[in-house]
């Protein structure tokens, strides 16, 4: 498929669309294990419904739960609808041996069909630790140059296939590498009813998109083969952007804020930008290797930095780019990721690479690393501003998008909370999983604040399967509810030993569910698959899927995730339901 002179490949959620990239590098370290990866299993109906019922019970009255159990029994009866749907799902799995029965459905349902803004509801951020290096590293352009140089080194390994496939655990289990295709030179494109993701060829698109004072700039920071310039030369290019952008009073209308709008609204605004004669400019922005945002603001506290990374003022961003590096005027920095085709596993690996490259102690007298893979610069193309032609209709769209974004910001609160009383090591001395312990603490906290129990989601990564992404761990259980009630309602009457016993049962339940989810045997993804093969247009229906407890049990008022990295100050994402 082509758009003017530059070719691109486009997907609507099926990882197989770009399979040619893997096949062209099948012998490379990054992709050579792909064909040997196990396929995502289809769990049995019995184990899925056992997990589902146990997790639904804490959210239901006794009468509601009996109705839910009755619907499940009817679904599971011999020769019933459940068997038919399971057979269809197994057949789909066999038909997609080169992928996964779930991947395309999940990419569409969870991401590309979602019509809300990506910022807040899809995007996630990482707050990098401050640079401990020399003063030059801590300036805005110095920090940005150091990070960008490391990112471009990582990109060379990705597009060349020389990056080894990621492995996990003591057994060094290989993980699927498919998502790496969507890290660089990729951009989500809005549509009225569903989005698409475009991949541009790295060759010929080694430029980066730099945003400064709401303006877009195409900046060349590598040679023709993608080898990055030195940090010093990259810094010079970034300083040239700052000089071109001018003082704050010269800011232009922020085209970038359109990418923060709802997807149908942004799709219509994008069509208008194309009609205004901006096709080539949009293409250069979307085809860029990544985006780098040089912000005027200087957030100090972790909460201030978190908000600035998570959404900022919405103007100096391109929220559809897979990777955006954000650097503030005081040198604080982080990453903003677009989630539709790529989970956090690849980007945390990128972050680890960048942090180790930029936090190292080996600098020369000028403050630059003594060893770096860089291309000598004989001549360099100056940064090119992308100055959009804006019709009155486009100008009105920008004003409306700004107002919508500002209202959305005002509806959100964020606070980075740090607990210093004890940590994971002390929790482990009690033979308790730190992750499960924190999940139970969250359950107790919600009940203390609201007097309610909330459906709680925690992802488990299943990248060890071909085209696997995540499974769902349901953190609320009967065991968790029993412990919370013992702590809150009966703490004066229950001895400590009994409450500790209940905590251990709750933790064991969570750990067991987590282990099953890590094997792609969670209830939610399987139930989604069964609902997808239901032929509702032919009169098929099941009370399982219309049961209010089913809806309530997957209405994630609390959405959580577990990630640890020594060089991240914080990280996060937004709520997944309006009252979450």
Spans of features found by a protein language model:
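Conserved ATP phosphate-binding architecture of protein kinases
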Residues: 324
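Long, Pro/Ser/Thr-rich low-complexity/intrinsically disordered regulatory tracts in eukaryotic proteins
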Residues: 1-321, 329-331, 338, 342-580
């Amino acid at each position: 498929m082509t758009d003017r002179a530059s070719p691109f490949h486009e997907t609507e959620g099926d990882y197989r669309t770009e399979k040619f990239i893997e096949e062209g590098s099948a012998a490379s370290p990054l992709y050579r294990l792909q064909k040997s990866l196990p396929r995502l299993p289809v769990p049995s109906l019995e184990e899925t419904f056992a997990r589902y019922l146990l997790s639904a019970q804490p959210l239901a009255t006794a009468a509601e739960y009996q109705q839910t159990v009755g619907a499940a029994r009817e679904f599971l009866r011999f020769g019933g609808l459940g068997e038919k749907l399971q057979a269809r799902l197994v057949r789909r799995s066999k038909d997609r041996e080169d992928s996964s029965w779930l991947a395309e459905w999940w990419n569409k349902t969870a991401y590309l069909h979602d019509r809300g803004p990506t910022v807040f509801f899809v995007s996630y951020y990482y707050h990098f630790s401050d640079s401990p290096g020399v003063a030059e590293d801590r300036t805005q352009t110095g920090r940005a140059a150091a990070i960008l140089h490391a990112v471009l080194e990582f990109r060379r390994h990705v597009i060349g296939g020389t990056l080894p496939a990621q492995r996990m655990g003591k057994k060094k289990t290989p993980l699927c590498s498919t998502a790496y295709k969507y890290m660089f030179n990729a951009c989500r494109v809005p549509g009225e009813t569903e989005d698409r993701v475009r991949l541009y060829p790295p060759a010929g698109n080694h430029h980066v998109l730099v945003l400064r004072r709401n303006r877009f700039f195409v900046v060349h920071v590598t040679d023709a083969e993608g080898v990055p310039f030195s940090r010093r030369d990259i810094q010079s290019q970034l300083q040239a952007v700052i000089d071109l952008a001018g003082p704050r009073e010269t800011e232009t209308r922020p085209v970038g804020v359109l990418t923060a709008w709802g997807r149908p609204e942004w799709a219509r605004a994008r069509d208008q930008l194309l009609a205004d004669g901006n096709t080539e400019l949009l293409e250069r922005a979307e085809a860029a290797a990544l985006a780098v945002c040089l912000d005027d603001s200087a957030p100090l506290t972790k909460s201030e930095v978190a908000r600035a990374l998570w959404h900022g003022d919405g103007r100096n961003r391109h929220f559809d780019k897979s990777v955006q590096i954000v650097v503030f005027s005081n040198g604080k920095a982080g990453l903003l990721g677009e989630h539709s085709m790529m989970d956090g596993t690849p980007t945390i690996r990128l972050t680890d690479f960048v942090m180790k490259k930029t936090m190292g102690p080996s600098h020369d007298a000028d403050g630059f690393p003594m060893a770096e893979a860089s291309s000598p610069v004989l001549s360099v193309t100056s940064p090119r501003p992308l100055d959009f032609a804006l019709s009155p209709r486009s100008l009105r769209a920008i004003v409306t998008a700004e107002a919508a974004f500002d209202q959305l910001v005002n509806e959100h609160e964020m606070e980075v909370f740090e607990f210093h009383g004890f940590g994971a090591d002390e929790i482990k001395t009690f033979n308790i999983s730190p992750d499960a312990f924190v999940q139970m603490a969250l359950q107790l906290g919600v009940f203390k604040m609201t007097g309610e129990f909330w459906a709680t989601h925690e992802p488990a990564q299943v990248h060890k399967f071909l085209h696997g992404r995540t499974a769902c761990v349901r953190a609320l259980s009967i065991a968790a509810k029993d412990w919370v009630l013992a702590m809150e309602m009966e703490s004066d009457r229950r001895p400590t030993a009994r409450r500790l016993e209940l905590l251990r049962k709750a933790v064991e339940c969570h750990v067991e569910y987590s282990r099953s989810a890590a094997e792609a045997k969670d209830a939610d993804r399987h139930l989604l698959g069964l609902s997808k093969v239901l032929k509702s247009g032919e009169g098929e229906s099941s009370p399982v899927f219309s049961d209010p407890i089913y809806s309530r049990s997957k209405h994630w008022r609390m959405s959580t995730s577990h990630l640890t990295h020594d060089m991240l100050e914080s990280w996060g994402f937004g709520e997944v339901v309006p009252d979450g």
